[in-house]
Amino acid sequence: MSHVLEVTEIHTFIGQFHILEGVSLEVPDGSITALLGRNGAGKTTTLKSILGLTPPSKGTITFNGEEIQGQRTHHIAARGIGYVPEHRAIFRDLSVEENLKIAERRKGDLARRADFIFDLFPDLKRLIKLPGGNLSGGQQQMLAIARALVPENVLLLIDEPSEGLAPVIIEQVMEAVRQLSAHATVLLVEQNFLMASQLADRYTIIEAGKSVKTGMMAALVDDEETIRRYLGAA
């Protein structure tokens, strides 16, 4: 099995705080891998460490066979890694079209990818001239995911896509992630275990900055002890 991403024993500090104290994970090509754990476990910091936003001080991060830790964020992104942050980083005063265009790495990316993107997110085509701030929370999340697809990324890091959304909208977001996984490998941080269990093939659990368990999602669903110990209320 080939792995698009391999993270090995990374340690990351934010200021004087030792946030990640030995996180390892593997993301197989073509998979949806869920990064699970309680609030504050280090999941978002792991994504930011992969991207170089909070560079690790120790350990290795390998993308498509090449080590990328220590590289600048824009160099890492240019290799084909897209990021959808937790708080839907869209420009509220710009139109949907302008939000998409600003995500281009090369001139014409949106034109080349438009059919693919609007097949996944037909509502965005209908709303193309509306300001981002006029969209519903679910539509803004779709736009945030679509922005990460404007360049031809092979790995998408998606942070808490269901955060703050109504159940009916969560279903729409889940369907979008399912569809895009046919075109890109996904590393998903998701606090909603039901959503993660229905989407992901594999999982890694982080507890207090350390990876503590990894495996197939189908087995985790029936592992009540692991769910209670690492994913239940603290």
Predicted features along the sequence, with ranges:
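Conserved ABC ATPase signature
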Residues: P131-L135, Q139
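The feature captures the beta-strand-to-loop junction immediately N-terminal to the Walker
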Residues: L36-R38
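Conserved structural motif at the start of ABC-family nucleotide-binding domains
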Residues: L5-V7, L20
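ABC ATPase signature
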Residues: L94, L135, A148-L149
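ABC ATPase NBD coupling module
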Residues: P55, E67-R88, A114, R126-K129, ...
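Helix-to-loop junction immediately C-terminal to a conserved catalytic motif
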Residues: L51
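A short, proline-enriched helix->beta-strand linker immediately N-terminal to the Walker B motif
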Residues: L149-V154, H183
